[in-house]
Amino acid sequence: MMDKKKLHIAAGVICDKHNNVFIAQRPLKSHMGGFWEFPGGKLEDNETPEQALLRELQEEIGIDVTQCTLLDTVAHDFPDRHITLSFFLVTEWKNELTEKKGSCRVGHLLCL
């Protein structure tokens, strides 16, 4: 039996002052393409989950996070991989939310 690929992902639950939450749709050709998710990405070597979150949100949606708090870390086994997800509540940032080409199909602020 082959070992499953192991990934650690940092994701941001981006909540504005009006309690709107930003979600993004995964590119159709990616793993789980078309699904909706909180933006973020994989940790690089020697990177903490918070460092990965800050880097990924800048790369994917153009924001510089100034305030975030770890909400929870959960693990899930898919048939082909083991994923650890670290979720952060993001409440303050600089710059406007901008969908960068290739990072997501579309993003939306949803009212809770």
Swiss-Prot record:
It comes from the Bacteria. It catalyses: 8-oxo-dGTP + H2O = 8-oxo-dGMP + diphosphate + H(+); 8-oxo-GTP + H2O = 8-oxo-GMP + diphosphate + H(+). GO terms for biological process: DNA repair; DNA replication. Residues 6-112 form the Nudix hydrolase domain. Its EC number is 3.6.1.55. A motif (Nudix box) lies at residues 41-62. Mg(2+) binds at residues 40, 60. Its cofactor is Mg(2+). Keywords: DNA damage, DNA repair, DNA replication, Hydrolase, Magnesium, Metal-binding, Mutator protein. InterPro entries: Mutator_MutT, MutT-like, MutY_C, Nudix_hydrolase, NUDIX_hydrolase-like_dom_sf, NUDIX_hydrolase_CS, NUDIX_hydrolase_dom. SUPFAM superfamilies: Nudix (SSF55811). The keyword Transit peptide does not apply. The keyword Metal-binding applies. Gene3D superfamilies: Nucleoside Triphosphate Pyrophosphohydrolase (3.90.79.10). It is an enzyme of class 3 (hydrolase). One of its GO terms (molecular function) is 8-oxo-7,8-dihydroguanosine triphosphate pyrophosphatase activity. NCBIfam families: mutt (TIGR00586). Specifically hydrolyzes both 8-oxo-deoxyguanosine triphosphate (8-oxo-dGTP) and 8-oxo-guanosine triphosphate (8-oxo-GTP) to the related monophosphates, thereby cleaning up the nucleotide pools and preventing misincorporation of 8-oxoGua into DNA and RNA. It prevents replicational errors by removing an oxidatively damaged form of guanine (8-oxo-dGTP) from DNA and the nucleotide pool. 8-oxo-dGTP can be inserted opposite dA and dC residues of template DNA with almost equal efficiency thus leading to A.T to G.C transversions. Belongs to the Nudix hydrolase family. This is 8-oxo-dGTP diphosphatase. The lineage of its organism: Bacteria, Pseudomonadati, Pseudomonadota, Gammaproteobacteria, Enterobacterales.
